[in-house]
């Protein structure tokens, strides 16, 4: 499990995937999200720019990212 502590009020989904190290680049994040491979709070998310806030949970490729 990866934890991301927010410095601002939110982080975008693509940025969170990169920050946690579960994708190598923004392009990888873009395709993972567009292909419906990423879940936010248990729901498939297809918007790479979705704003994540404290308490959100992201799942991708067997990895979990918790936003704090």
Each predicted region: which residue ranges?
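A detector for short, charged/polar N-terminal pre-domain segments
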Residues: 1-11
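A positively charged, amphipathic N-terminal helix/segment that binds anionic biomolecules
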Residues: 2-3, 57-68
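A basic, amphipathic helix-loop patch mediating RNA/tRNA/ribosome contacts
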Residues: 9-54
């Amino acid at each position: 499990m990866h934890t991301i502590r927010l410095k601002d009020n939110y982080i975008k989904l693509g940025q969170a995937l990169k920050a946690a190290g579960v994708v190598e680049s923004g392009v990888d994040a873009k395709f993972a999200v567009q292909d419906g491979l990423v879940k936010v709070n248990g729901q498939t998310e297809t918007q790479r720019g979705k704003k994540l806030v404290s308490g959100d949970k992201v799942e991708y490729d067997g990895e979990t990212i918790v936003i704090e």
